[in-house]
Each structure stands twice: as structure tokens, then as C-alpha cells.
Regions:
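Flanking helices and flexible, charged tails adjoining ferredoxin-like Fe-S electron-transfer domains
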Residues: 1-9, 53-69, 100-101, 109-111, ...
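Ferredoxin-type iron-sulfur electron-transfer modules and their immediate structural context
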Residues: 1-95, 100-105, 109-111, 115, ...
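Membrane-proximal soluble regions of multi-pass membrane proteins
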Residues: 181, 186-191, 328-338, 555-560
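N-terminal signal-anchor module of multipass membrane proteins
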Residues: 214-220, 240-302, 548, 553
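Long, contiguous internal "core" modules enriched in hydrophobic/ aromatic residues
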Residues: 273-274, 278-285, 299-304, 344-348, ...
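Membrane helical hairpin/interfacial module
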Residues: 292-295, 301-356, 363
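C-terminal ends of transmembrane helices
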Residues: 326-336, 406-418, 547-551
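A cytosolic-side transmembrane-helix exit/cap motif
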Residues: 474-483, 550-560
Length: 560
């Protein structure tokens, strides 16, 4: 959020930015060292660093330097997605962070298209370049500006026409990183090099770096082994970039400009791992169970059954509770999880989603208690039947919200283009119906559900399986993507590291096998029974494997 002037204590007429003059930069890393010293940045993470990119073939070679850091965007996505206002934009345009408010959800890292944010290993909170705000507020320049021996870093108020930065911006043609993301970055480069500005010009995992070991991107990998495992040469290998269908840019016409490799860069690991796809599955199942039962009873698809209501209610509550537990488990500061309710930032779909989850849990919990009391004879069944439609119809939009709110959260993750699919809300809703139908089929194996309920569940399950298969193959991966970054992530799922998760896990195990089992059950007359339950289990496993690939693959694509 933008802080009011009286709270931030800064001049709202100012707009601070940086200019990096690549004509002067010698790649000495003095700025990186000064930043670490001034801000006490721990080892292993960086607020500013110098990226080295080499182009050409010996003897026609050249090394390009690029000082990389937070862009202090005029339209910062990290601020919008932060659920507790730990990331905020000052009135003078500086994007600042408040470590005391951070819960370590890592959403800001997914929202930043520049890899500028990291989790401090000592505090477990998000941090980044903050324009040395403690110095700026007393009239001093950032430490990196002061220490640069070539005056290659220029900082100042871009709204002041007499400032050096304003004059440089007026006189020189400048470039920024990823202008297509719509963040309006305020870190400008004079003589910016295309190969350095575009992180997708080379593969993410290099074979080696100057002065640094290459850390594995994934747990269990050894050093540079990640590149071989992925079947690519990595950034350390010299690669031709003439094919514009494969890479986003085409470098000149000379031989020396058609080869590129990254000699040094700061290394970044994936912020989100298995708990996120697991929570997508658990909340989808819980919401799907309630939606199917609520719609079925409300629209008279099947008669109400007290035992089915009790079991459906407790399963929904437990699954949404497990969803909440997974979300808290994934926080780097889980002890602060209540901050999302005590100091919410309402533009964030993390904050909105938390309220939806809590509201849905409370409503379903009360409904389940009433149904349990009526089924046990503690309350008159007629009294509960009177209020039942109110709970079911109020719960339906909340259940749909639980199923799809993550699509809007992913849309705020500006650093992961594949997640910003306009089909994602519908896709998550279909997956929820599929998972809910599968849950009822497993329930039917252990308890005698009314036949109409079982048939409704298997019908919804089959239709949702077919719809999900169509949306996955045609909608998400069959239609050209809007950006090269999204296309690379989709390629990673279809043909790269996650191809087995996708084809054998999602498509074969999660869709083809369940549909085949349902067909066999229909032919032999066992449409509802153990065959359907096995199909449901296959669908659950396939759904998790798909969500795992969908969450992890976009994080493979580098942002810096």
C-alpha cells in the first residue's frame, strides 16, 4: 500500500529511482559489498549483485556487466500480494519492507518478476534493496552509489529536473528489465545489453560460475548435476541464439553476437514446494464434497440422508483444516500466522483467501454440529431441516470461493506467467467437482450411501474428469501462451523435467485410468463400488502430480 505522507514522513512529491550507466561499470562488485556491509545482509543472499554475461566466440568476445537489484517499481506487484503490508510503497516511491510484519509466506518472491526479494536466513522474513532508506531520509545517498569508483550508479529524485538522474534520463536512451510485466520499473540502464536484460536468453542451471560453486536448484542434486539431469547444457555452456522461436531475442548479425553465456549471477532457489500443491488438492476435495452435497440436496438430485450429511460435513471440516495446516506449515514464520487476520492487506488474495477459508470452515462446522445433533437425536430433525437450506445455499458460494481463490492469488504472482491463465478459475472449479465426486465414491465403499447420491457422484466425477482432461490438454497447454516465459514453463511440464508427472501421472493415472475403470464398471454393472473407488484414488494421485508440476515448473524459469 502507499503510506500517507504523515505516516511515512517522506515527501510525496518525490519519486526516487536508479540509473545504471553500463558505459562506466567495471564489474568490481564494490556495490554488492557496500550493500552487504551497510545493511548487514547475511551470507548466501544478496540485495544487489553484478551479473556477468559473456558474448561472442574467441577471439571476438566481450563481457557485459549488469548491476541487478530491486527496481522500486511504480506499480509494485510485491506490495499488492503481501497479505500483511510487510511490503509497502512509500510516498516517495521507495518500495520498503517491514520485517516485524512479515509472516514468511514468500508470495512477494513469486510476485517479483526480477528475483529481487529473498528470505533472510537469520530472521525468516522477506528482505531486499530498500534504497538505503535510513540514509535517504537524512539526505545521504545509498551506500552503493557512494562506493562506486566509476560513478556508474546514479540515484535521485526523478521528479526533480535539476537532479543528475533526471538529466541522464532526458539525454540518453535507457532500457529496463521486463517492461511487458507492467510494473513500471524505476531502475534504468544506459547501454543495457539484451543478453543480460533477458534472463531466458540462456538456460537457468549453469555448469559453473566464476568464483562460485553452482548450487543445485532442487534438493538431492549435486552441484552442476542439475543441468545434465534436465537434459540441457545450462548457462555455462555456450549456446546459439539464432532461433527466435526458441528464445525471446535475436542478437545481431555478427558471429560474436550470436553466442552468449552467463559467467556469474546470484543464485535463487524455489520459494514454494510440495505443501502448496498439497493444499490445492485438500481444499479442492473439501470444497467439492460440500458443493456436490449442497447442490444435490438443494436441487433434489437425491434425497437428503442424515448419515451422509454428517460424514460429508466432518470430511469437509477436516480437509479445510488440513489446508490451513499446510499453509501455516509453509510459512517461514509460522508463529505469526495470525498476522494475516490481525493486520490484513485487503488487496492480497492471500488475505482474502484466509477470510474465505475461515468463513467457510465456520459455516460448515456449525452446519455439521447441527446435522450431527439431529442425527444423534439431540435436536429435533424438523428444526434442523428448517435451517438446512440456509446453510447449504450460503455455503455454496463460499465453497466455490475456496476452490478458485488461488487462481486470483496466482494472477497476482507477476513473476510466474504460466499461473496467470484466464482459464485457471474454471479449471480449479472443475478439479474441485472431480475431487468431490471422487471422495463420495470412496465414502460409498465404507458406508451405504443412498443410490441416487452414489449415481450423482459418479456422474459428476466422470463428467468432471472429461472436462478437466479437455481443459488441461487443450486449454492450458494446447493454446499458444501469451508470453515466452509462460511457454517455457509449459514446455517444462510437457517435455522437460516434469513430463513424467504430467503424462504418466496426470494424464494416464489421473484421467485415462479412472475413465477406463468407470467404463469397465459400467460394462460389468459395478459402476459404483470398488472399481469406482480405485478410479477415485487414481484421480487424487493424478491431481496432486499435476498440481505439483504446475506449481514447480514456472519456478524453473529464471527471473534474473
Amino acid at each position: 500500500m502507499t503510506l500517507p505522507v504523515e505516516r511515512s514522513g517522506v515527501d510525496s512529491a518525490k519519486s526516487y529511482g536508479f540509473v545504471i550507466d553500463n558505459r562506466k561499470c567495471i564489474g568490481c562488485h564494490a556495490c554488492s559489498i557496500a550493500c552487504k556491509s551497510e545493511n548487514e545482509v547475511p551470507l548466501g543472499v544478496n540485495r544487489t549483485w553484478v551479473k556477468y554475461v559473456e558474448t561472442g566466440v574467441f577471439p571476438n568476445t566481450r563481457r557485459h556487466f549488469q548491476v541487478t537489484r530491486c527496481n522500486h517499481c511504480a506499480n509494485p506487484p510485491c506490495v499488492r500480494i503481501c497479505p500483511t503490508s510487510a511490503m509497502y510503497q512509500r510516498a516517495d516511491g521507495i518500495v520498503e519492507f517491514d520485517a516485524s510484519a512479515c509472516i514468511g509466506c514468500k508470495a512477494c518472491m513469486q510476485a517479483c518478476p526480477y528475483d529481487a526479494i529473498y528470505i533472510d536466513p537469520e530472521t525468516g522474513t522477506a528482505a531486499k534493496c530498500h534504497y538505503c532508506a535510513h540514509r535517504t531520509d537524512i539526505g545521504l545517498e545509498p551506500a552503493c552509489v557512494v562506493v562506486c569508483p566509476e560513478q556508474a550508479i546514479i540515484a535521485g529524485d526523478m521528479n526533480d529536473p535539476t537532479a543528475e538522474i533526471s538529466q541522464l534520463l532526458a539525454r540518453h536512451e535507457v532500457t529496463v528489465r521486463k517492461p511487458e510485466q507492467g510494473t513500471a520499473p524505476k531502475l534504468f540502464y544506459i547501454n543495457g545489453n539484451d543478453a543480460a536484460l533477458h534472463p531466458t536468453a540462456v538456460e537457468r542451471t549453469p555448469q559453473t560460475f566464476m568464483w562460485a560453486d553452482v548450487l543445485p536448484l532442487h534438493a538431492g542434486e549435486q552441484g552442476s548435476g542439475g543441468a545434465e539431469e534436465r537434459g540441457s547444457g545450462g548457462a555455462g555452456e555456450t549456446r546459439r541464439l539464432a532461433d527466435s522461436q526458441t528464445y525471446p531475442i535475436h542478437f545481431g548479425g555478427r558471429v560474436a553476437e550470436q553466442m552468449v553465456q552467463v559467467a556469474y549471477n546470484a543464485q535463487h532457489k524455489m520459494p514454494w514446494h510440495w505443501p502448496v500443491p498439497a493444499y490445492l488438492v485438500t481444499k479442492g476435495i473439501g470444497a467439492g464434497i460440500f458443493m456436490i452435497f449442497g447442490l444435490g440436496v438443494g436441487l433434489n438430485w437425491f434425497p437428503f440422508d442424515g448419515l451422509a450429511a454428517v460424514v460429508a460435513g466432518i470430511l469437509t471440516v477436516l480437509l479445510i483444516g488440513l489446508t490451513t495446516a499446510l499453509l501455516v506449515f509453509d510459512l517461514d514464520r509460522p508463529g505469526r500466522f495470525l498476522y494475516i487476520l490481525l493486520r490484513p492487506q485487503w488487496r492480497s488474495w492471500l488475505a482474502r483467501g484466509a477470510v474465505i477459508l475461515i468463513g467457510f470452515s465456520l459455516l460448515v462446522g456449525i452446519w455439521w454440529l447441527l446435522e450431527t445433533a439431529a442425527y444423534s437425536g439431540w435436536l429435533p430433525p424438523g428444526a434442523v431441516a428448517t435451517v438446512r437450506p440456509l446453510f447449504l445455499w450460503l455455503g455454496l458460494p463460499l465453497a466455490a470461493g475456496v476452490a478458485i481463490y488461488t487462481a486470483f492469488l496466482f494472477a497476482q504472482a507477476e513473476g510466474r506467467d504460466l499461473w496467470q491463465s484466464p482459464l485457471l478459475p474454471a479449471h480449479l472449479l472443475i478439479q474441485s467437482f472431480m475431487a468431490g465426486g471422487a471422495a463420495f465414491l470412496i465414502m460409498d465403499l465404507f458406508m451405504a450411501l443412498p443410490r441416487h447420491l452414489s449415481l450423482t457422484a459418479v456422474t459428476i466425477f466422470a463428467v468432471a474428469l472429461i472436462a478437466d482432461l479437455f481443459v488441461t490438454l487443450v486449454g492450458e497447454f494446447g493454446i499458444p501462451h501469451a508470453s515466452e516465459v509462460a511457454a517455457r514453463a509449459a514446455h517444462e511440464i510437457r517435455s522437460g523435467r516434469y513430463r513424467n508427472y504430467f503424462w504418466w501421472g496426470c494424464i494416464v493415472l489421473g484421467h485415462v485410468a479412472p475413465l477406463g475403470l468407470l467404463v469397465v464398471g459400467w460394462v460389468v454393472g459395478w459402476l459404483v463400488g470398488w472399481l469406482a473407488a480405485v478410479a477415485a484414488v487414481c484421480a487424487f494421485v493424478g491431481l496432486y502430480l499435476y498440481e505439483y508440476a504446475f506449481v514447480m515448473a514456472p519456478q524453473e524459469v529464471p527471473n534474473s
